[in-house]
Amino acid sequence: MSTSEFLSRASKTKAKASEIKEKDDVELPFCKYAERNGCKALKLTYLRKKGFPDRTVICPGGKVFFIEFKRPGKPLEPLQKIAQSLLLSFGFEYYVCDQPGQAEKILDNFLAFSS
């Protein structure tokens, strides 16, 4: 599937309130942590199509990676797997986080080894 086909087939997601609250419990603290470490964890609403990762993390020096936040043990959806493959094929790093504190450890490692 081409990039344009993926973007045209994808539609905006509407998560249930319970899912948003559970994801916010992990996602929002990570965003604050990223800020404290000189990075930005952006939710790209223009690109927020079904399957696109939850956060695009931009760091000093032009370093970028993507994070998908999931409930513990929940696998990626089919469109998320397509987006993951697309981003990896362009050379970006892509992570799936399903535990509190996991994204913070990923950011620490990314900053330590990408300089």
Residue ranges of predicted features:
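Catalytic phosphate/metal-binding cores of nucleic-acid and nucleotide-processing enzymes, i.e., regions
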Residues: M1-S115
